Structure formats: C-alpha cells, structure tokens
Amino acid sequence: MTDIFERVKSPFYHFGMLMRLNKIPYEDFKSYITDRLGDVAEQAAHIADEILAFTSCHPYYTQQLSFAVWNNLVAGKYEDVLQLAIEDIITTHDLDYERLWLNFNKTDKYVMVSICEGNNPAQDRNQPTSTMTSALLRLSKKGYIIRSDRYEIEDPFFRKWILKNMIE
C-alpha cells in the first residue's frame, strides 16, 4: 500500500509526509462504537466487541465494518448483523480480491492460505526456507501481511474471502 508513495514512478511519490497510524486502543474504540450503535442496537457493547475482534482494532477496517453493521441495523436487519455486514463487504470486494489473488504467484498463495489457517510459514518445512522468507518479505512489503507476534493478513475481509473461496 505504501508503494504508491515510495515508488519513484508513482504520481504520488513523496506526495506528503508518510505517517504510519497505530491501532486505536481497544477500550477507546469500543466506547466510541458502543456510543454510536447505542441508538440502533440493544446490545451495542457486544456488537462493538465482535467488530473489534474481527478487525483487530485496525482503524480503517473497523470503520468499514461498523458502518456496514450500522446500515444493516438501521435497515431493520438484526439477525446475525455482524456476519451479514462481513458478507456484504466481502461480496462488494469479491472481484477486487479475485483479481488480487490471480496476480499472486503460487508461493504467495501458499503463504497466504497458510497464514489464514493459523500457521507460521516461516516455520514451514514443506517448502525451502529461502522461498518462504522471500515470499513473506515480498507480501509484507506490498502490505498484504503484517507481523506482530505472528504473521497476519492485513485485511480481515480478504482473510475471510481466502478462507471461504480458496480453502477446500
């Protein structure tokens, strides 16, 4: 994602100061979401917990999911409101995810599926270590995966799409 600001041939190269945003603290985010959903949902705190668990407090994905949940609640859809919102977002981005997936090489796909299944590709002994390391670095640099205490798919909706469509 940062490529568009760091690649010399990009029209956005050094467009402005690049700022990396940290995750918003859980309790602050929960309080904010609970307040906003309080007018349309009886169990706003529970829904906020579910949203934050799914997005891991990532600001963009939390905002996206919260908005979809809110829209569903306002439309009178109360049953499985979180899953419905997740499915709506995945359906909206289905072609984008498919196009993205088709541009990955075989190793990158293997790594992405492995991460989705909760495995650590760096410790995978079915593939050469150098191959796994190269793939992890490449996917990290492109912003598809992040590493905290373990590797994770950055976009929780893409992770869910992979689990739904690519794992048999």
Name each region found by the language model.
Residues 1-53, 74-77:
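Helix-loop-helix "sensor" segment of P-loop NTPases
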Residues 21, 111, 155:
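Conserved RecA-like P-loop NTPase ATPase core
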Residues 45-52, 63-66, 112, 133:
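Short, well-structured alpha-helical segments
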Residues 57, 63-129:
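Winged-helix-like regulatory helical subdomains adjacent to P-loop NTPase cores
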Residues 57-58, 155:
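Short loop-to-helix capping motifs
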Residues 125-142, 146-148, 152:
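Short amphipathic alpha-helical interaction segments
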Residues 150-156, 160:
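Minor-groove-contacting beta-hairpin "wing" of winged helix-turn-helix DNA-binding domains
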Residues 158-168:
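Short, amphipathic alpha-helical interaction segments positioned at domain boundaries
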